[in-house]
Amino acid sequence: MKYRSLTEEIKLLELGLPPQEEDGFIGGNLDPKEASLILIPVPWEATVSFGEGTSKAPDNIRLASHQLDVENYHYIKPYKAGISMLEVDKHILKLSNKTRKKALRVIEAIECGESCKKDLKYVNEVSKTINSHVYEAALKRIKKDKFVAVVGGDHSCPLGLIKALDDTSKEDFGILHVDAHHDLREAYEGFTYSHASIFYNVLNECKNVSKLIQVGIRDYSKEEAQRMVNLGDKGDCLYDTAMQAQIATGKSLEEVFTPYIEQLPKNVYISIDIDGLEPLNCPNTGTPVPGGLRYGELEHLIFMVVKSGRKIIGFDLVEVGDSKNGWDANVGARVLYNLCGALLASQGKIEYR
């Protein structure tokens, strides 16, 4: 890929010309050295437990973003701060496909009341390797004073980034997690780094995470619900049914979301599983669930973090599905650009309104 300088990038994006197919996110090809925000694509989905296809999401989102206009209502010209999406690592995609086949054998064995120890060991070892890869990629950029985000892939993908932030942060930080699921299972289906275990692992491996706020949850196990209760002051959850009930009685989004935003510390990491949205906006995500946030509700929730004065230190977008008409990637690209704007605005890199 031939990179552009930030000056060249801004000039080209403001011309509004159709991007070339090989161009990066929003049609950019910014040299990562000049970017404020680095997007790390992670085409990984070995442990998904229902629908497949999210390993294709990073590239699908890149392509779908080519038809986005770069202006944004809340966030003033995010592209001017410099956003660079790294190229998809084809080796990881190939490894994901290979590991997925072994994971399926493990899942099928469980369903038959059997075990498949050799394949399970392989999946867990490779998953650990992926976590290390993401950790090193993120740490390298963080040490160069870049902001970093992950574009998955399944929800196991951002663990390496969160751990890199945990290891480099001088202060505690909270996590705002939007999802249909708690993702608090311990080694779901035997996979230590399952997509359904991301926040179990985060809470056990990251010492500086002081708060976990979850929004949109509507499909969960007894184990997970109890684990959330056991977090005490360290966690809180706005279940989707409770959220919808408040909205139905006439409460504004500000009234509904504020008690949860106020619990977050000044530094916030945002994790967005696209299935936190209503299925209209993510029909091909791996585990869709009826209900969920409307697109505008998610947009407002994120903006409330920014206008509260909190600083977004990183984020991830995961579980975007694959579809022939490109709708899932289209929505994913818009959520991603919104997250980029929110982080940059919260960090004073751009203005917001």
Feature annotation, model-predicted:
Residues 2-353:
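Conserved alpha-helical scaffold segments that buttress catalytic/binding sites
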